[in-house]
Amino acid sequence: AGQRWQIDPDGGIVWRPGNDTPHRDHLEMTGEQISTVLRWVVDDRGAFRVERSLIFPLLRVRPNDTHASLMCRVATDIPSLLAVNTSASGFNASALQFERVEKIVIDGTVRVFSQWSFNAVGAGYEEVEHPAPVLAMERTIFPSPTQPALCERYLIRNIGSQTLEISIPEFSQIVTTPSERGITGGYVIRAELLDAGIRILQPGDSTVVDALFRACRVGETLPPADVGAELRSRREFVSAISDKLVLETPDPVVDTEFRFAKIRAAESIIKTRGGYMHAPGGECYYAAIWANDQAEYVNPFFPMLGYDIGNRSALNAFRHFARFM
């Protein structure tokens, strides 16, 4: 298939699917209370699908060892929950269909740009195999920097010639784990759409739909959700780390790899009750001491990066490790 990814002028990497589909990949991103591994695919029709592996290192399960994070995989298809109505007087809503991904950008978030079309329903309409695109969608997936939440923002724009009504349902998907399997009782894993209702889009207009994937202890109240604020915070973090310890070589690929390595090392720090602790990740290594990964590799790097939370995590790792020496 050749080289898929190119370096974006803004510092990320971008892939524009062509004749190199289907293609699948995975990527991990982390915040202080959540890590997620996105397993995604662009299929042979050009549609995007994603499975989210949600890891909550502070919600402990049995046996309470160093791998005891609450984990759950969720493949909820958010765009499939939306519907489009083109009737001026009635309500004959159609599901979004015929997605075609234009590009995917990875730069501290995962952004998927695609176009959608649909077949209208009701008398007088007939099925068309390749209807013209009427909606453009930019979905942005990222972890909350501080909360146990994976955030998804869907920016939807009317690129057609007629007024569209976007129907956003009230939606929540809840799993409650058995209390005897959690160290502090049962846990609630919740997927939800925010701000349900009808949005009217004139040609050229756009709207935002937000989704959250969160977890908490049974009986615990989750804080109010503000995906826009979470996205700004995530972007500020990525920008701050990118501006530190900048590598400049004759090879832009090496420079970009180093920038991504900085972001990954700095983001993957869990705020445990014992202080900040670096997490190697991989759906396995969180909220504990990992002597090689911390003491030998990442701890000496954080002072050179000039990242305060990284420095604090390094000191915590050494303090905890010293108790066993």
Residue ranges: model-predicted function:
Residues 1-256, 303-310:
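Terminal accessory carbohydrate-recognition/targeting modules of carbohydrate-active enzymes
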Residues 239-325:
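Substrate-binding groove/exosite segments of carbohydrate-active enzymes
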